[in-house]
Regions:
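N-terminal glycine/serine-rich phosphate-binding loop of ATP-dependent small-molecule kinases
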Residues: 1-51, 98-99, 159, 172-178
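Surface-exposed, flexible loop/turn segments at secondary-structure boundaries
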Residues: 39, 48, 62, 110, ...
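Gly/Ser/Thr-rich active-site cleft segment
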Residues: 72-183
Length: 184
C-alpha cells in the first residue's frame, strides 16, 4: 500500500480554510492543530518547500527496511514515522549534505504557518515516530544512527498545550496554542 501526502496541498487547504473561517467569523484568540500521526514530510530549511511527497502513516513501502533493521536489533513497525522519514531522506539527500527538516504533518503545518520560525512537534505526535527512547524523553541515537537521520533535521518537542508561535500566514497572526495527534 502506497499512501502519499502532498505537503503543499495540505498547507494550501489549511490556509484556505483558515482564511475563510477568519473572514467569516472574525479574529480568534488562538488556533490549534490536530493531525494524523506518523505521516512524514521532509522539506528544505532554506526554501520551506517539501522535497517531494510526504508518506502517509498507512503506507507500507518500508516494510522490508523494518525487517532488515529488526534483524540488526532495531525493531520498528512500518506504520511509524522513522523508516518513512529515512526513505524520504534517501530519495532527496542520499549523502545527507542538505539542510532539511523532518516532521510529521503538525511540524510541517507549524513551520509553514509561522513562516519557518518554529520547527516543533508535540509529545502525542513524537510518540508514534519510533525515533524516541522508550521513555520518550530524548531522541534514540541508536535508531537515528541506523537510519542515518541527522538530529539537526528533527523538530523540537513541545507540550501539547501552550503558545508555540504566531500563525503569521493567517490574517491577524493568531497564536498557535495547541498541537494534538489523532486518537488521543
Amino acid at each position: 500500500l502506497v499512501a502519499q501526502v502532498e505537503g503543499g496541498d495540505v498547507v494550501e487547504a489549511v490556509l484556505d480554510l483558515g482564511r475563510a473561517v477568519l473572514a467569516e467569523g472574525g479574529p480568534v484568540d488562538a488556533v490549534g492543530i490536530t493531525n494524523q500521526r506518523a505521516s512524514a514530510v521532509v522539506w528544505d530549511r532554506a526554501t520551506g518547500e517539501p522535497v517531494g511527497p510526504g508518506i502517509g502513516w498507512q503506507d507500507l513501502r518500508t516494510v522490508i527496511d523494518c525487517l532488515t533493521l529488526g534483524a540488526q536489533g532495531v525493531r520498528l513497525a512500518p506504520n511509524l514515522t522513522a523508516t518513512k522519514a529515512a526513505h524520504l531522506l534517501d530519495l532527496a539527500d542520499p549523502d545527507r549534505t542538505r539542510d532539511l527538516c523532518i516532521g510529521t504533518v503538525d511540524s510541517w503545518l507549524v513551520w509553514t504557518l509561522t513562516g519557518g520560525a518554529r520547527h516543533v512537534t508535540d509529545v502525542t505526535n513524537v510518540g508514534l515516530t519510533g525515533l524516541r527512547t522508550a521513555d520518550q524523553l530524548e531522541w534514540d541515537q541508536r535508531v537515528l544512527d541506523a537510519l542515518r537521520i541527522p538530529t539537526a533535521a528533527l523538530p523540537e518537542v513541545v507540550d501539547s498545550s501552550g503558545v508555540i508561535g504566531e500563525a503569521t500566514a493567517l490574517p491577524g497572526a493568531p497564536p498557535i496554542a495547541g498541537i494534538l495527534g489523532d486518537q488521543q
